[in-house]
Amino acid sequence: MNRTLPLILTAALLLTACASAAPAQPNAAATYPSAAASSPQQQSAASPLTPKFPVGHLLTLPQNQNGSPVWNTGDALYELRDASSMTPEALLLKTDYAALTQSVYCGIPGCTHDSDACPAYLASDFCVGVMAVDGTVYTYPGELTNVAPTQIYRIDPATGKTPVAAVPDALPHHMQLQWCDEYALYGCPLAASHQPGTLYRWDWQNDTVQTIPMLADEKIIACEGSRFLTIRIEANEPFPNFGSTEQEKAILAHAVYVYAWLDPATGAREKICTRPYADGYFHNYYDGRIYYTGNFRNADTPGQQASLLYFDTADGTEKTLLDGIPLDTYGIDVCVPFSPAFAGVPQRYLRVQTAGDAYADCLLDMETGDVLPAPAVTAEGVRRPALLLACTAAGQWLTAANPRDSYDPQYSLYALWDPADFLADGQPAAWVTMYAAE
């Protein structure tokens, strides 16, 4: 489910941004015909469509830095943790922000957490996710495969696991469930190249499935409120059914990306803007801005450069956040906010990670373009950067640090920070007492 894309920054850029005393300001706005917002005349004049089902607050189903499923309620973090590196067994853990403790999500006295009698025990965590709805925790099949569970289970720490919904036959095999709201889970399997697709809505609480048609080459890349943000390729001529690579390249040379809002309840789309197909690498949507890489120069040379741009939906202009980024030096992934997306609350910082160094973490300020290094903490006598993981309802940041010499996804130490101290290279406000298997 990881859909990250690379953005490249140099060491000099990092040093300049991190040492800057005053935040850098974005470059002046520029408007391009290909980046213009849709005018009212371009929108459909048809009567409003009737919603076919309720849509709540859409979220991308979150993962942590290791690709493991997590869920942040603002008061606690729920996650699946491998019980052993030798077996597929896993445990559902809860990190309580107020109590500063991580524990197995089980309240049965004397439970050894090693069988299905334990509410938190999973014989296998392959293709399993965790979510919380209305204060209740569930596990669900993250991808519909032969090794995935066939049920959604309600987890009661006092009594055990209860199956509440079976995977319906109407959902296609191997589809990933990537988004959710208060009512349903959503998935959109990959369609054949240049062919229409289908978005599936599984209302697991009422045992129904709805389908929403997707346009050719259309993909969901983000969500806000009750709408999905989509991107699709639009060309001046149809793609041949069995065209050669050269034919396709010739068509794509004059194609554009179309960004639009999709209302899943009605199927209606609202066009936002278009960008040249050559400008790719969508990175994030934040505060009415679509961030992507563009303005490629010196293509296919060691000196190739690009810019980090954003389209501002508030005024219909494209702006440059970072310019002159050499593409052969530093790789930084800025596709998603540090997971699990602050329980759905937007933040101005992106978690970024330098290529080739699992411990080098930074933040990108999406308002100023500053790149800030993660502060280092001493955990068990070892200095490691504090990797951002979640945000609490009280506004503190939860971080993870791994003091092991070799990267061990089963082992991390959590801490809570005041954001100002984190950004000032300070120290955490408190450490979390982690669960340790007996």
Model-flagged regions — what are they?
Residues 1-9:
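Positively charged n-region of N-terminal signal peptides that target proteins for export
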Residues 45-61, 87-115, 147-167, 192-214, ...:
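Surface-exposed loop/turn elements that mediate protein-protein interactions on large endomembrane-trafficking
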Residues 60-73, 114-131, 171-182, 214-226, ...:
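Repeated scaffold domains used in trafficking and secretory/extracellular systems
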Residues 30-68, 72:
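N-terminal low-complexity, Pro/Thr/Ser-rich intrinsically disordered segments
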Residues 15-17:
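C-terminal motif of bacterial Sec signal peptides marking the signal peptidase cleavage site
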Residues 68-86, 127-145, 178-192, 225-250, ...:
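Short beta-strand elements that form the blades of beta-propeller/WD-repeat-like
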Residues 19-22:
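Bacterial signal peptide processing site
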